[in-house]
Amino acid sequence: MPRDTQKSKVYKWEKEFFGDIQRSSVWTEDQCVKYINEAYKWWTSNKDANPVKVNFLNDFNRPSSSYFRPASNCIALQKNIHTNPIVCSHELAHYIQHNDVCRGEAWHGPVFMRVMLTLIDKFTEHSLGDMIKSARAAKVKVAGLKRPNSNKAIRKPSNTFYIPKLTEKDLKFNSSEVYTREWYEAPAKIAAA
């Protein structure tokens, strides 16, 4: 596997682009599991896709980060700080890269970024174009629609094959607010005033 040379750049970009939402616990465990599995079905265009195994960790007895473990094919989320759409999409992108797109690429490489940004674009109000432009300005590489060193396309899901069974209620925060760009930009607007 190639060296993960842009890992720190990816984390830095996520923190700058998404702000505090990235380290917020805004969904219940059930919302996280449903989102991950529905988003995975959408990606694969397969309503019968095997469920993605998701575990929840307490930050006092595990490393403080969430992660995907290829050996167990499991996503682990810190339940007190990482139950939100950004971290769920980040870890699901690792799962998709490992299982469906192209094993052997760097964990935070251009292919991973394309998958993650596609998920975030589909399931939040962040624009794919804005995220790619921002990431590339931060020197984070994002793959085009073809796999590196290959003529094969990175599979871009089609909305016509599987419509995710996610309602507005499924995407609400624990505080009953729906995750929207306005919600997440509001603290910055208040601070600037």
Q: Where would I find each of the regions flagged by the language model?
A:
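Non-catalytic architectural context of zinc metalloproteases
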Residues: 1-12, 85
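Metalloprotease/metallohydrolase-associated module, dominated by Zn2+-dependent proteases
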Residues: 9-65, 70-78, 101-193
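Short, small/polar residue-rich loop motifs at catalytic or cofactor-binding pockets
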Residues: 82
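Active-site recognition of the HExxH zinc-binding catalytic motif
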Residues: 86-99
